[in-house]
Amino acid sequence: PAVRLSGAYTLANLIDEWLTDPSLPEQVRREEAQTIIDALTGCIRTPYPLAQKRQVLEADEAPEGYEGDFTRDQEALREEQLVRRTVFMEFSRRLAAVAESPEKDNGENQQTVPPISPMWADLRFDFGGAPIFYPLRQLYFQNADFASATFYGPADFSGATFHGDTSFSAAQFTTDASFHGANFTDWVGFSAAHFAGAAEFSGAHFADAASFATVTFTGGADFSNAVFSAAADFAVASFESDADFSRLNTAGIASFAAVTFDGKAVFTASTFHDEAHFAASVFNRPAVFSKSLFGGVARFAGVVTKQSAMFSNVRFASAADFSGASFTQYEDFGGARFDGDATFSRASFIALPRTRYEMDFPQRANFDNAAFAQDADFSKATFTAHVGFYKATFARE
């Protein structure tokens, strides 16, 4: 692939030449550079039939019954991967230089001829619908559009940095995907994407709003230690396997409204600084929120937990709304503290074992019309302000 690699390097350098040509107006320089960018990203979007065979061709031996010349296909795939990844690496090298030292020219990059123009940050990179079949870890991206892209084999963006608005909307991840430690400095959208394998977002940082609305996670989803500095939207997402949000930190509104959790959902020791919405969500396996902090309003109205629901030692610093919630098995609110008004009106507690509610309510607590199908023990609960059990029903021993 020497000729194609040389072409990629030449075109990348030509972009630099256009952007740094002082004889041309900035608009002209930017338009000419964008034209070359569009040509290179067009190559990335070109279909490649062997991409679908990536995992087979990256094996040591051909599987029984393989159609075609396995060795030749392996070589062809490796060459195509090298060429396409080189395009990303050339983009990344320049974008990293702009991001790390956008204003200064202290001679550190004197070996780069021509110099890197800060106008690289204004360019758009359209990879929409592209087949991606190679790792892109630890690269820099700017204004990247991966909408409707298909990732064949493991999608590796671990340690990557994304500047500018980024879209993975309706992207298809055919197997495992890793965004471990990735850094998104601006808006990012994964809405309607599908993760067929494990989705790894542990330690990822989202500096602006992030949308995972209507995403389907077929494999396990790991958002442990992820940081969302603005809004985090997971509304109507579907988690078909275990979901790990332990030690999650959200600074903006976090929405998990109408989400379906078919696997175990773990939010242990998480911090929600703003409102947290779990209204109408369904937990088909254990839901664990132990030791978490809800700094804003916590909305669990209409939530359904079909197995254990663990809220032990949770602190609700503002109002908590569990109206109409349904707890069908064991629920544990031991040591939970409600600093704001707590509403459990019309909630159903139908777990079988006797439950002791060792909860602290400094403000109003509303259990009006709640239904307790098991023996409920509030002897260890602390009610400092008004408490209401109007028309609440309790099981008899």
Name each region found by the language model.
Residues L5-A12, E17-E397:
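N-terminal leader/targeting and pre-domain segments
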